[in-house]
Amino acid sequence: MSDKLSYKVADISLADWGRKAIEIAENEMPGLMKMREMHSESKPLKGARIAGCLHMTLQTAVLIETLTALGAEVQWSSCNIFSTQDHAAAAIAKTGVPVYAWKGETDEEYIWCIEQTIYFKDGKPLNMILDDGGDLTNLVHSKYPQLLKGIKGISEETTTGVHNLYKMKSSGTLQVPAINVNDSVTKSKFDNLYGCRESLIDGIKRATDVMIAGKVAVVAGYGDVGKGCAQALRAFGARVIITEIDPINALQAAMEGYEVTTMDEASKEGNIFVTTTGCADIVEGRHFENMKDDSIVCNIGHFDIELDVKWLNENAVKKVNIKPQVDRYLLKNGRHIILLAEGRLVNLGCAMGHPSFVMSNSFTNQVMAQIELWTNTDKYPVGVYFLPKKLDEAVAAAHLDKLGVKLTKLTDKQAKYLGLDKEGPFKPDHYRY
């Protein structure tokens, strides 16, 4: 392992710029700061060697430094070839944390970066995984199965990665206990909804400068991400059409006043298309052929499988790169398609991703999950678990002061009437916020 690079980033000279930006992000991430305040002396993650595969952004930098403050050794790669913020990566690498990430990796470089995080500098392998999308989890299970027995747990950040964990569990291939961070209420109902509500528009605007008011926007999927995207597009004056497979989500969309139809129909009407489903083959060749001239097409689901970019590359008459992560395709019918971020995450490929405050919710859950799996290993046989409701409420509580929120306290009489502890949890596990 002696020939291993101590880090690989785009430009280490960006570290000072990154450090200034990280300091600002810290002030917007009260949950992570609370974790440092509570645990930096006891260091509950001492001995943990955490391999992380998650967008290497300023917010992730605050997460990494929280994990190290709590005693962990950490190595990091990004979970998307376009999502790294190079100044953030440089700032973390300069502190001595091995980071292997830069914006604009090839697919081969992407896998190489992940592999660099498997073994630490002393030759010892990872014993914890912090994942976003499942690529690190899948790589270790398929290529490094001899290491699985030494791994105490996996914490998974996003919907796509959680789907992957449940598929592995049902097929019997999952060999490590995992916590589903995505479905913590303070993750899915905040990051997925409010984060996308702001960062989608940021990505589209930075990439295209398009006027959204008056346009027809098509949002594929009406889960938490789709809800946030639809709200944002409507707020900017677009007429929004939803596509859905689930009758419950479709009914929700209709009751909010959105038109709900199929992509075959919507592709003829839209000017802006956003996929949010986490599923494959949402926009296919026939849909591109239906679209109006210069329709803008983008994806905010984790992988680039939602849009048939391969069809565009094979069937377009011409492809012109307008600027980084913005490509204009000329189709045989004479119309153009503007594709953002090559069909990958538009909010991170074309903008800066979610704001720090909402990511503090998600990443505080990640820290709690890592502590839980590392310190209470015996409680977690192989399977997929949720964080307890009490911890979910604690994440929310850590963010209230920053917003000037004053919480009402139950009286003894009220608590007795409701059958609750005055300090919570306040809702049953099955409650749908």
From Swiss-Prot:
GO terms for biological process, alphabetical: one-carbon metabolic process; S-adenosylmethionine cycle
InterPro entries: Adenosylhomocyst_ase-like_sf, Adenosylhomocysteinase-like, Ado_hCys_hydrolase_NAD-bd, NAD(P)-bd_dom_sf, S-Ado-L-homoCys_hydrolase_CS
Keyword Transcription regulation in annotation: no
Chain sites annotated for binding substrate: T57, D132, E157, K187, D191
Catalytic activity: S-adenosyl-L-homocysteine + H2O = L-homocysteine + adenosine
CDD domains: SAHH
Region described as NAD binding: 184-351
Biological function: Catalyzes the hydrolysis of S-adenosyl-L-homocysteine to form adenosine and homocysteine. Binds copper ions.
Subunit relationships: Homotetramer.
Name this protein carries in UniProt: Adenosylhomocysteinase A
Species in which this protein is naturally found: Xenopus laevis (African clawed frog)
Lineage summary: Eukaryota, Metazoa, Chordata, Craniata, Vertebrata
